Amino acid sequence: MKRQEIDHIPFDLTVEILTRLPAKSLMKFKCVSKLWSSIIHNQSFIDSFYSISSTRPRFIVAFSNGSFPSDKEKRLFIFSSSHEGHESSSSVITNLDTTIPSLTVSNNLASRCISVNGFIACSLYTRFTICNPSTRQVIVLPILPSGRAPDMRSTCIGYDPVDDQFKALALISSCIPNKDSTVEHLVLTLKGDKKNYSWRQIQGNNNIPPYSPVTMRVCINGVVYYGAWTPRQSMNAVIVCFDVRSEKITFIKTPKDVVRWCNDSILMEYKGKLASIVRNRYSRFDTFDLWVLEDIEKQEWSKQTCEIPLSVWDSVENFNMSFPGINKFGEIILAPTCLSGYHLRSFYIFYYHVETKKIRRVRLEGIADDENFRRCYGIGSGQCNVFISPEHVETIRFL
């Protein structure tokens, strides 16, 4: 009796099945055959995979292992998990996705670690690194050119959905006492041969008044936003808007309380609109203000004060908290800015629902709560700064 031949899976069905698989599995399956490799590298497949991934975003936690005298000992760990359930209290298991050697981050204007369209961008003063946890591609951008000392440097990444283009934006602001701050704007287009990557001056923005950038950046629908004071001496608050596609810079007038220094005001997207969460660093963490840009043309803002019972923080060592973003349930996420130093403690994040005013706590299991892991990588011997991206979308794209 002849063995019946197994029918081949139709090509379209093969493609459909592959789009449903995890990104890491696809990276392994490229070695199965030339056909599968060509499918996975096809731009149409990459776009389809990203579209499906956007319906199931992942929760990303990145943290460094403290301060070491040698760069060889420094590490940046990137953990991820599927989105947590909408419950009053729960725990979520996280998995280590990627480890980036010789890289660390800190909590200041010159350092940041954020997710933009599937890529994690990490900046630390003159060094700017971009990685894809799914493909494990790591790109170290050229060091920023020397400026006139003293100055402050910061970098971020923006994405233009029209041209499907990533660009890095660098700000070099002068820090001369008793003078208005001048800012040099540099751009690097993430396209082509990486050996030819270079920073270039933004053209056509000669009429920009002096200003001092004072907040972290956020990219929403092709525009990078950040808070600033202009002119520096009178400290008028504005939101600076950098259009990634046109590379034009404009200002949005804001109430003074919308923009504060560094982590005291955090910009984010709230229900499709630009928002700023503002807290008072000199008081106990029981209230914060949510400012929302309701009409960008009229430059009109709304304000809502949110209250949190102090008993919520019983499981947290200190009140040094940050606001990483908002989830699909409309909950504002609150999280510690660093890991527990020398003590093996659980890592908790909190969710505050603006409309119902309810707050819930979620324990993230696996975030450096293993003694062997901490000892192996030196966690606890220095400040371990934490950055969270709650809406990370996996991509198999390479830059």
Curated annotation (Swiss-Prot):
CDD domains: F-box_AtFBW1-like. Gene3D superfamilies: 1.20.1280.50. SMART domains: FBOX. InterPro entries: F-box-assoc_dom_typ3 (IPR013187), F-box-assoc_interact_dom (IPR017451), F-box-like_dom_sf (IPR036047), F-box_dom (IPR001810). One of its GO terms (cellular component) is cytoplasm. It comes from the Eukaryota. It holds the Pfam family F-box. Residues 3-49 form the F-box domain. This is F-box protein At1g30790. It comes from Arabidopsis thaliana.
